[in-house]
């Protein structure tokens, strides 16, 4: 595992990055829009060298005494999945679920690519290239992020259906494919070194859907990120949003050469690639939920509400939501499915059920935390206010007491407000409500993954003292994934320049 300093230096490459409202970012390691998140990724790498973290983030010593990062492991057993899950949970929770795309997530993308090309069986070279790329990530700690490859809205509304795909091949060379186009929203491209562009890009090659790993620093690549989440300049008032902003973005490719060893031929659906990614994503959602519960518990104490039963009922609602998803993750790890090479995929039915539970609970959990502390959540002061001679003593009277200084209580309230009442929280809510297709897509995934239709239906019939027809309902699993946000260009509307 490389160090955080080595990762920081790797970002000082030839990448071309724009942030909306900020313009061209010449060095993402020092610019105010990106520096703080770079620092958090530096911390992620450096934890692997910190003795206090090594029992969580590293494997046990092998025969030679060597330890490897769980973040880059290939899970071969339920025990491996459990250990990887513990490492995800431990490293994501301190970010309040806001660091969703890490180099470890990139390893799971690469595992999905490798499994998908093994399923497709196009050629031995495809498998060799995919395996070599995953090994490269594990050996170097290189940071890969994910894009489904969906086109931008302007492309999808083009009058000619043949021009609506995100990418097109400009030419084919001995070295690889030269591609051009614009890929829609994905997370953390400004901090990654590679972006996987998935099958929604619409590029076909040799009778298969072509997907790509594109280096962010490659000639012709431009990353365009959304505006920075609004936040106060004082970190006391923005303890999370001053540190964590992954900056979703688009990827523009202007005649970019993708080497053959980074071209992976798959099926038209990106689902096979994402088998491990969905599991990691649920850990991020769970970390957000656990942080919400932790804040609620801390506020119960700080606001003197531990004997207030209506408040404790709110807390139990949060506990129920958290424990439901924890149980789904445990089940997914203890009931895995085999990949093509025998690696363990977390049980997809359990991950889908947990994802649906989290999608349904997330808005209410945030609402409960907004309710629980009362109006103090809105009017809590800053550290600078408390240090101001004219009002500091009065604020101490207003917010101190019950075993807390005003500074301590205000810090907790500002943390809670930043978690569920900030621009960063608004972005997370808006994004996750439609992530991976939203609730309808997750229902389809669960319908596909649930394996007991026939067993349950026929089991009921066996309780009757009659000869009953055999029921075959396994065909329910053959459901198409809902089409993601199909658009229809308005008829006859003139194009605008």
Feature roles, as predicted:
Residues 349-494:
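Alpha-helix capping/hinge segments and adjacent helical runs
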Residues 311-316, 344-352:
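Short, charged, amphipathic alpha-helical segments
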Residues 59-194, 200-209, 222:
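Glycine-rich flavin
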Residues 119-124, 300-312, 335-340:
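Inter-helical turn/loop segments and adjacent helix faces that build the functional surface
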Residues 245-330:
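A conserved active-site cap/scaffold subdomain adjacent to cofactor or substrate pockets
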Residues 151-281, 458, 463-495:
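FAD-binding core of flavoproteins
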Residues 35, 39, 135-138, 178, ...:
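Generic structural signal for well-ordered, non-transmembrane alpha-helical segments
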Residues 1-44:
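N-terminal-proximal low-complexity accessory segments that begin disordered
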């Amino acid at each position: 595992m490389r160090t955080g300093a080595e990762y920081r230096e790797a970002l000082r490459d030839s990448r071309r990055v724009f942030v909306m409202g900020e313009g061209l970012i010449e060095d993402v390691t020092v610019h105010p829009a990106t520096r703080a998140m770079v620092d958090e990724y530096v911390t992620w790498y450096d934890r692997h060298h910190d003795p206090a973290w090594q029992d969580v983030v590293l494997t046990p010593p092998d025969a030679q005494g060597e330890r490897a990062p769980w973040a880059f492991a290939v899970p071969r057993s339920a025990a491996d999945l459990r250990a990887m899950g513990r490492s995800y949970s431990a490293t994501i929770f301190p970010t309040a679920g806001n660091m969703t795309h890490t180099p470890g997530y990139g390893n799971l993308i690469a595992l999905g690519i490798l499994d998908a090309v093994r399923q497709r069986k196009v050629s031995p070279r495809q498998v060799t290239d995919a395996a070599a790329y995953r090994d490269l990530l594990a050996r170097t700690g290189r940071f890969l992020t994910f894009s489904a490859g969906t086109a931008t809205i302007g492309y999808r509304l083009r009058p000619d259906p043949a021009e609506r795909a995100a990418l097109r091949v400009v030419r084919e060379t001995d070295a690889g494919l030269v591609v051009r186009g614009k890929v829609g929203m994905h997370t953390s491209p400004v901090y990654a070194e590679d972006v996987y562009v998935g099958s929604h890009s619409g590029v076909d090659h040799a009778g298969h859907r072509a997907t790509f790993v594109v280096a962010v620093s490659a000639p012709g690549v431009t990353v365009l990120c959304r505006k920075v989440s609004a936040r106060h300049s004082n970190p006391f008032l923005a303890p999370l949003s001053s540190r964590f902003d992954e900056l979703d973005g688009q990827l523009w490719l202007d005649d970019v050469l993708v080497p053959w060893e980074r071209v992976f031929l798959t099926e038209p659906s990106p689902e096979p690639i994402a088998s491990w990614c969905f599991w990691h994503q649920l850990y991020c959602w769970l970390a957000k939920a656990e942080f919400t519960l932790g804040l609620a518990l801390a506020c119960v104490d700080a606001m003197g509400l531990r004997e207030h039963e209506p408040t404790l009922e709110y807390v139990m609602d949060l506990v129920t939501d958290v424990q439901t998803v924890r149980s789904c993750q445990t089940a997914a790890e203890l009931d895995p499915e085999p990949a093509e090479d025998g690696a363990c995929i977390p049980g997809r039915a359990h991950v889908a059920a947990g994802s649906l539970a989290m999608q349904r609970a997330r808005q209410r959990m945030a609402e409960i935390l907004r309710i629980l502390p009362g109006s103090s959540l809105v009017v809590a002061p800053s550290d600078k206010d408390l240090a101001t001679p004219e009002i500091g003593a009065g604020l101490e009277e207003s917010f101190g007491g019950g075993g807390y200084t005003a500074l301590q209580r205000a810090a907790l309230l500002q943390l809670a407000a930043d978690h569920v009442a900030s621009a960063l929280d608004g972005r997370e809510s808006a994004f996750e409500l439609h992530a991976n297709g939203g609730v309808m897509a997750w229902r389809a995934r669960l319908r596909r993954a649930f394996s007991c239709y026939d067993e349950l239906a026929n089991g009921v019939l066996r309780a009757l003292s009659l000869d009953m027809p055999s029921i075959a309902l396994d065909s329910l699993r053959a459901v198409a994934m809902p089409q993601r946000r199909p658009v229809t260009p308005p008829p006859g509307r003139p194009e605008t320049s």
